[in-house]
Amino acid sequence: MRELALQGGRYPEVDMAFALNQIAGWQTARTKLPSWAECADIIYPPHLSMEQCSSEQTALYKASLVEKGVSMTDLTGGFGVDFSFIARRFSSATYVERLADLCDIARRNFEVLGLHHADVVCGDGVDFLRTMKPVDFIYLDPARRDLNGSRTYALEDCTPNIIELRDVLLEKARTVMIKLSPMLDWHKVVDDLGCVSEVHVVSVRNECKEMLVVLRRDSNAPLRCYAVNDDETVVFRASDAVASTVRLVSDTSEIRRGSYLFEPNASLMKLGCFGLLCERYGVKKIGAHSNLFIADESVDFPGRKFQISTVSSMNKKELRRNLSFITRANIAVRNFPISSQDLRRQLKLKDGGDTYIFATTQGERNHLILVAGKV
């Protein structure tokens, strides 16, 4: 890329800025949008739009949630990735985007992708919403950056303001899906919007990517939550999570060699349904603020699973005796008074290997070092 940019003067007939942008976009698409990267005629947008667009994996997940219907509208079109997958579920699909350049790109790409039923509208999504005919489904991905380009995390600070538009959205469609930042408090989102029937927290390779909120007109069904991590999905009713009780380890003696250690995946961490995990999987939480769980038996837990080989206090002699055979380890701290870097220096261990060390707290002040291997 850099060499090509430096040689731009040798090819005056080539729009070098455009060419470099297409190469960079394709390189990103190879991992983010593999089916698009295989299509030679796709046009890629500027870097920010590529950075902000959904991945193919998360777009496919959204499409899987949508019932087949007659008509849908995406009010915040962007690069059009989500639209391109969801639109295949409908006979008629409208993409709305205020930036003319993105509309031109979308119009071309939709033809290339065989979405001949897609209608591209260049205009403001809110203005279009107020005058559009009712449809079966509306999708929005509100902007989460302010005028200065800084990220915003409050629902009311997103553009457009979904809270203000809720009623008109539900007048125009029976079902509305909104993509939000996973940084938002999902409890507050539900309270702010009302009419929420589903909350999906979607992770890819245990990295939280997005929160999806589904609103349905006149729905009396209980709120359901979906913790998604790649092909693994945990579903529960929000009311069941509220009614569940966290089971805590009452004494350090319950944490011993041979015990199984579990760490929930990123989506479950975000949803925070820890009591439900205790009841559903028969595990106990090590501490009130330590989001690690143990059990005597191995269970099919949604997250990382380890088996403990050594349990140690922070006593120097005990540490020396228990960790003398370890030269390198992956170190994680969970509710612990020092950082993983400081602990690594204190234990004089190199990074990596097959050994995992979890530093955590049982009870109020019982600091523990758990040495474990992945199962």
What are these regions, as identified by a protein language model?
Residues 1-375:
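SAM-dependent transferase fold signal centered on methyltransferase-like domains
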